[in-house]
């Protein structure tokens, strides 16, 4: 953990690079080892957000370490700079998951 789920209507050319870069960013923002960051990207989706211009929805889950008010701007800027999606067309959901509800390596964290 953390887990980053990126859904966008934009077509992303270098998916592996984008996943690597957003993993690095979220690792830095949460002070969690990049080794434990998992990221998923679904691009070129049919999405609607007031109209059909490109948009993006990010879901970020973690056991603690989330500071939505501090993380929203750098993540939005990343999406704008790397994906070309304006900040006003981005939603981000931050979800703090209890340790007892998150499992890795056959065991929960709490």
PLM features per residue range, with description:
Residues 1-110:
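Interaction-mediating elements
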